[in-house]
Amino acid sequence: MGKYDINFEGELVKVEVLDSAELISSWIIDRLKPKPQEEAAVVVRLQEEEPVVVGLDLHASKNKRGDCSANSLLVLCMNDAYCLVVQLKYVDNIPGNLKKFLSDRRICFVGVGLDWKLSRGVPPSHDPLVCRTVELSHLVARICKEPSYCNSDLKALAATYEVPYEPPASGGCCGGGGRRGRINYEARVFLKEEVKTLVRDAYVCYKIGQKSVEALYRDETTQEIAGIGRQ
């Protein structure tokens, strides 16, 4: 557990790493509660059915055979400057607010390789994670009307939307590695640099997804995000 202020190219992102169902539930409630100056904008968005964009990522360690184990960490980034890292291995139960949040059809969860990552499952003490996800490359390809983007990696997509992104120096089948070696995703406590690595992809996916959706509605396109997502 812990709170961290992470700097991404001059943007300060507040990250919380949590293993308490109560604290996770509070984080979700706080993020969905509009500030007074945002209330009018939120009402307009709901009336127009513009989805809330959330960057999502999952991390898993390797077992003794070298295969990916069940996901140990769930990462969510939203509201410009907030990320949550849920320690699935240690939380007693996944709170109802988080389950409801993940299944909310007004929320568009964007990321890379999400079908595969979700297929790794969660620790057996928890119910499977169910959420409506959109593969970021497919979202960008559809909005930009450029099919070739479907094969683009996160670095290329970030360049398209001018979002700063520097991939980890090393990686693995279960998630990115830190610059000083692989991260133990089952650790109780993480170094600040490790936390930055853990949330980097989810945060960049959020930024790109948000810009994509804003462009979609700015151009008054009638496509619905639901048509390219899944439940």
Please identify what each model-predicted range represents.
Residues 16, 21, 25, 53, ...:
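Conserved DEDDh/DEDDy metal-dependent 3′-5′ exonuclease domain
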Residues 59-63:
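Short beta-turn/strand-loop junction motif enriched in small, turn-promoting residues
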